[in-house]
Amino acid sequence: MSSSVEQKKGPTRQRKCGFCKSNRDKECGQLLISENQKVAAHHKCMLFSSALVSSHSDNESLGGFSIEDVQKEIKRGTKLMCSLCHCPGATIGCDVKTCHRTYHYHCALHDKAQIREKPSQGIYMVYCRKHKKTAHNSEADLEESFNEHELEPSSPKSKKKSRKGRPRKTNFKGLSEDTRSTSSHGTDEMESSSYRDRSPHRSSPSDTRPKCGFCHVGEEENEARGKLHIFNAKKAAAHYKCMLFSSGTVQLTTTSRAEFGDFDIKTVLQEIKRGKRMKCTLCSQPGATIGCEIKACVKTYHYHCGVQDKAKYIENMSRGIYKLYCKNHSGNDERDEEDEERESKSRGKVEIDQQQLTQQQLNGN
């Protein structure tokens, strides 16, 4: 899936999201802008919009969504008023079918709506504050399944109605017939879909193949991210590069190779678990266990997101060095290489001196 997304910078800093018409990046996620500068939208505003489905084509995309689909959803939103601020652009509806509440993403937060986000399962749902209690039981069921089987391919049993993103009805009160027609069209599209595939990391809702515990995609990305290694005993899977650059994984020596991509399986599982709390600097999704090598830097990435964000990867197999420097610190790698070279020479000299001293002691005895 090609990506034409670029970070907002320079003259584009004043651009506003086509949905919420704001610059609330802290609440709504990164503001993504198309290459032609004509479309801008917050990542969260797109992820939770009712009629947006992830794009799997090679055409231009915005945060994993088709530019054309984003434009259609923005246009649909011009006729949908927010239940909290009463402004247009409210394409995020309560997931209870009979509820007519619709929001902007930040308005849903301010109105204390319940946000359900499970990227590895492609689930992005909102329940208004009135229906929080209704959603509680299904949330508990989902959480249990997510904790136990996050890395396990979805089975037909797991695709119960309560775990799907359901189509939302919008508030048609006071809208023209044309508006009702447009809004209903968006709802009809959702009803024809068996699953709301919102995650740009997912390939297909019917795809039951193993997915990487870090980047949440499967073997289709092997060429760019390395072989997908599968550990059936723990229902775990991970791409080689995702493990190689992950901060906490331990690569085994040549004399003790494991069957899980030459990595200590325990450290891989620990990293996957840690990754659930680590959101990517670029895409805001969990699983970002690759951190910038500069200690003071807080940027973390998925392997492919680091590449996309022009971070610099240092890979020296002979010396076992695998590092990432974000684009702001990419100039520091040369200095680190020099320091490591000096340290390596110093260690080598100490070892030689120790060997000579030991030999002299043996000869003296």
UniProtKB/Swiss-Prot annotation:
<feature type="compositionally biased region" description="Basic and acidic residues">
    <location>
        <begin position="342"/>
        <end position="352"/>
    </location>
</feature>
<dbReference type="InterPro" id="IPR001965">
    <property type="entry name" value="Znf_PHD"/>
</dbReference>
<keyword id="KW-0804">Transcription</keyword>
<feature type="short sequence motif" description="Nuclear localization signal">
    <location>
        <begin position="129"/>
        <end position="133"/>
    </location>
</feature>
<keyword id="KW-0995">Kinetochore</keyword>
<feature type="cross-link" description="Glycyl lysine isopeptide (Lys-Gly) (interchain with G-Cter in SUMO2)">
    <location>
        <position position="227"/>
    </location>
</feature>
<keyword id="KW-1017">Isopeptide bond</keyword>
<dbReference type="InterPro" id="IPR051188">
    <property type="entry name" value="PHD-type_Zinc_Finger"/>
</dbReference>
<dbReference type="GO" id="GO:0019899">
    <property type="term" value="F:enzyme binding"/>
</dbReference>
<keyword id="KW-0805">Transcription regulation</keyword>
<dbReference type="GO" id="GO:0042826">
    <property type="term" value="F:histone deacetylase binding"/>
</dbReference>
<keyword id="KW-0137">Centromere</keyword>
<keyword id="KW-0479">Metal-binding</keyword>
<keyword id="KW-0887">Epilepsy</keyword>
<feature type="modified residue" description="N-acetylserine">
    <location>
        <position position="2"/>
    </location>
</feature>
<feature type="zinc finger region" description="PHD-type 2">
    <location>
        <begin position="278"/>
        <end position="330"/>
    </location>
</feature>
<dbReference type="GO" id="GO:0005634">
    <property type="term" value="C:nucleus"/>
</dbReference>
<keyword id="KW-0677">Repeat</keyword>
<dbReference type="GO" id="GO:0051219">
    <property type="term" value="F:phosphoprotein binding"/>
</dbReference>
<dbReference type="GO" id="GO:0043021">
    <property type="term" value="F:ribonucleoprotein complex binding"/>
</dbReference>
<feature type="region of interest" description="Extended PHD2 domain (ePHD2)">
    <location>
        <begin position="209"/>
        <end position="330"/>
    </location>
</feature>
<feature type="region of interest" description="Disordered">
    <location>
        <begin position="139"/>
        <end position="211"/>
    </location>
</feature>
<comment type="subunit">
    <text>Interacts with UBTF. Interacts with the NuRD complex component RBBP4 (via the nucleolar localization motif), the interaction mediates transcriptional repression activity.</text>
</comment>
<feature type="compositionally biased region" description="Basic residues">
    <location>
        <begin position="157"/>
        <end position="171"/>
    </location>
</feature>
<keyword id="KW-0539">Nucleus</keyword>
<keyword id="KW-0991">Intellectual disability</keyword>
<dbReference type="GO" id="GO:0000122">
    <property type="term" value="P:negative regulation of transcription by RNA polymerase II"/>
</dbReference>
<comment type="function">
    <text>Transcriptional regulator that associates with ribosomal RNA promoters and suppresses ribosomal RNA (rRNA) transcription.</text>
</comment>
<dbReference type="Pfam" id="PF13771">
    <property type="entry name" value="zf-HC5HC2H"/>
</dbReference>
<feature type="region of interest" description="Extended PHD1 domain (ePHD1)">
    <location>
        <begin position="14"/>
        <end position="132"/>
    </location>
</feature>
<feature type="zinc finger region" description="C2HC pre-PHD-type 2">
    <location>
        <begin position="209"/>
        <end position="249"/>
    </location>
</feature>
<feature type="cross-link" description="Glycyl lysine isopeptide (Lys-Gly) (interchain with G-Cter in SUMO2)">
    <location>
        <position position="173"/>
    </location>
</feature>
<feature type="modified residue" description="Phosphoserine">
    <location>
        <position position="183"/>
    </location>
</feature>
<dbReference type="GO" id="GO:0015631">
    <property type="term" value="F:tubulin binding"/>
</dbReference>
<dbReference type="InterPro" id="IPR013083">
    <property type="entry name" value="Znf_RING/FYVE/PHD"/>
</dbReference>
<keyword id="KW-0832">Ubl conjugation</keyword>
<feature type="modified residue" description="Phosphoserine">
    <location>
        <position position="155"/>
    </location>
</feature>
<keyword id="KW-0007">Acetylation</keyword>
<feature type="modified residue" description="Phosphothreonine">
    <location>
        <position position="358"/>
    </location>
</feature>
<dbReference type="GO" id="GO:0001835">
    <property type="term" value="P:blastocyst hatching"/>
</dbReference>
<feature type="modified residue" description="Phosphoserine">
    <location>
        <position position="138"/>
    </location>
</feature>
<feature type="modified residue" description="Phosphoserine">
    <location>
        <position position="199"/>
    </location>
</feature>
